[in-house]
């Protein structure tokens, strides 16, 4: 779960997805079986055509096939799997085709609404296609007409998965093998955004019409207490308000409650869809302007512009009888309604650092 106000410096280095790691290790293991060569690095082709060389920790024969492993390097992205050992075990099969299995640390889908059927290992479609493409090319190169059984695992993956949204999404037993481009872009947080989308899809597929998108622990607790919503209806959006709102264009629900800290929602109110301080900042003069439109005195406006934090500006406004929390929520509601379909009923709630409601709009 994300804190309400995470701060990180902006990094630069790219990394590779778990899907790329699975592709490299499965290819290396299969090559050992078909060509007899155990490599210490393997080249793979990413979905957009880039060729990359990935270093292996080991590549060795087993009693029933071969296995290879690599260390996941997410670059400078804050990825929960960074530094994890990802491995593939490959066995040859008489039937053609590639069959995927969840090894230790890789989850299994147990709920409808995801891109994979219930009962399938949580190896997403693009990584599956990457592995299939590489293994079929290897088979053709060596004149092999049989198939492959591929088991993907992540060392410690079951524990790491508890730090992700997988348990709430109904992916049990471990992590998902992810990636659409094969590359992890620094602080793109693509896996986190994908899990937001999956959370909405799972809620819809299981008949939930009212979801609550929350920026962190305190806002989620507030929504859970206010509406007695099931966990499946609670979407951990973190700073990615835009990921929620834009996905609802394609996958609408009947009702959206959005809840967050007052400062973060003031950024949404100003039109920012990424609420992290790297990408947006709190606009105290704009808060003062909204207060002025509600009758704030010149003295209050000046004090708000000079405030050290949004919370200080909020306290000043409330002490003077100006409902700044409601004003900010109303502006955030306007931004949200401009994005989601008219069929989605939207409401916005702001909380203070103690988790108390300080504003709302419908």
From Swiss-Prot:
Its EC number is 2.1.1.195. Pathway: Cofactor biosynthesis; adenosylcobalamin biosynthesis; cob(II)yrinate a,c-diamide from sirohydrochlorin (anaerobic route): step 6/10. It comes from the Bacteria. Gene3D superfamilies: CbiD-like. Pfam families: CbiD (PF01888). GO terms for biological process: anaerobic cobalamin biosynthetic process; methylation. It catalyses: Co-precorrin-5B + S-adenosyl-L-methionine = Co-precorrin-6A + S-adenosyl-L-homocysteine. Keywords: Cobalamin biosynthesis, Methyltransferase, S-adenosyl-L-methionine, Transferase. InterPro entries: CbiD (IPR002748), CbiD_sf (IPR036074). One of its GO terms (molecular function) is cobalt-precorrin-5B C1-methyltransferase activity. Belongs to the CbiD family. NCBIfam families: cbiD, PRK00075.1-1. This is Cobalt-precorrin-5B C(1)-methyltransferase. The gene is cbiD.
């Amino acid at each position: 779960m994300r804190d309400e106000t995470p701060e990180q410096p902006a990094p630069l280095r790219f990394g590779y997805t778990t899907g790329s790691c699975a592709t490299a290790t499965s290819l290396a293991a299969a090559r050992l079986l078909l060509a007899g060569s155990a490599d210490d690095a393997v080249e793979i082709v990413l979905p957009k055509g880039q060729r990359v060389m990935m270093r292996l920790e080991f590549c060795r024969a087993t009693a029933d096939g071969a296995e290879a492993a690599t260390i996941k390097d997410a670059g400078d992205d804050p990825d929960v799997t960074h530094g994890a050992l990802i491995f593939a075990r490959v066995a040859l099969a008489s039937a053609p085709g590639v069959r995927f299995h969840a090894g230790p640390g890789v989850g299994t889908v147990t709920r409808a609404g995801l891109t994979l059927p219930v009962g399938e290992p949580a190896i997403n479609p693009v990584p599956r296609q990457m592995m299939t493409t590489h293994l079929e090319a290897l088979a053709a190169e060596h004149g092999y007409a049989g198939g492959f059984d591929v088991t993907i695992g992540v060392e410690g993956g079951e524990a790491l998965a508890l730090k992700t949204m997988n348990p709430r999404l109904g992916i049990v037993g471990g992590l998902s093998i992810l990636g659409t481009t094969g590359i992890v872009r620094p602080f793109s947080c693509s896996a986190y955004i994908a899990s937001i989308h999956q959370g909405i899809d799972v809620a819809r597929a299981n008949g939930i019409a009212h979801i609550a998108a929350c920026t962190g622990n305190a806002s989620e607790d507030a929504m859970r207490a206010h509406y007695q919503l099931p966990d499946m209806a609670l979407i951990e959006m973190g700073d990615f308000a835009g990921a929620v709102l834009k996905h609802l264009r394609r996958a609408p629900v009947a009702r959206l409650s959005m809840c967050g800290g007052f400062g973060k929602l003031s950024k949404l109110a100003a039109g920012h869809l990424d609420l992290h301080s790297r990408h947006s900042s709190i606009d105290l003069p704009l808060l003062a302007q909204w207060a002025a439109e509600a009758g704030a005195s010149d003295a209050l406006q000046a004090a708000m512009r000079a405030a050290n934090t949004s919370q200080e500006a909020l306290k000043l406004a409330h002490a003077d009888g100006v409902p700044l929390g409601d004003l900010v929520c109303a502006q955030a509601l306007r931004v949200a309604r401009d994005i989601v379909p008219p069929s989605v009923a939207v409401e916005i709630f702001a909380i203070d650092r103690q988790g108390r409601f300080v504003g709302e709009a419908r």
